[in-house]
Amino acid sequence: MIPAIENAAFTPPNAAASVIKPYVMSHGTLEVYNLKASRRFYEEFLGFECVRHAIPAMVIRCGLKFHIVWVEGGDQLKPVNLLNHWGVDVGSRAEVDRCWKSANEQKEKYGIRKVLPIADQHGVYSFYLVDLDHNWWEVQSYEGFQHDDMFDFGDRFSMDEGAVSAEVSGIKAGEK
């Protein structure tokens, strides 16, 4: 099930006391080798809306009030770690299964470098893939609307907890 986004208007709870007074986190940036090849992947495989707004760059979006700017870096592109990933929510566990199967079947067509196994982890049912530009994507299903739930639940761990779990250490080392 795809959750309804009830109120997209938002006022950050600590904006009055902050130096910067944001009303929205508007965008992020990722690098691509080639705009044309990457656009095909983002539109045809991930289903995002793409617009070329500048000669070396494009923007993509899918829901909410947030977009990603992608910049053609060519040979200067630096691959990122799995922890530096972008999340894509789908409506059900069955849809995650279908997407995982499609990702494996269409690796060559879209230049997908790697598709990791599906797992139940950190409260979601998901898998990760690495695209043609070394960007990591997590395709996940979550019962509810994770964006709201994470903030509604509030802090679940103290900032004084210093130990990094073996799971996170393994992900950082690329052992996932």
What are these regions (language model features)?
Residues 32-36, 87-136, 144, 164-176:
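Vicinal oxygen chelate
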Residues 2-36, 86, 145-176:
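N-terminal beta-strand motif that seeds the catalytic metal site of vicinal oxygen chelate
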Residues 2-14, 49-84, 90, 136-141:
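Conserved short beta-strand elements that form part of the metal-binding/catalytic scaffold
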Residues 21-24, 79-83, 120-121:
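Short glycine-enriched loop/turn motifs at secondary-structure junctions
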Residues 18-19, 75-77, 117:
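Short, flexible, glycine/charge-rich loop motifs used to bind or transfer phosphoryl groups or to couple energy/partner
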Residues 19-23, 29-72:
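Core segments of cupin and vicinal oxygen chelate
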Residues 79-81, 109, 148-151:
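A short, polar/proline- and glycine-enriched secondary-structure boundary/capping micro-motif
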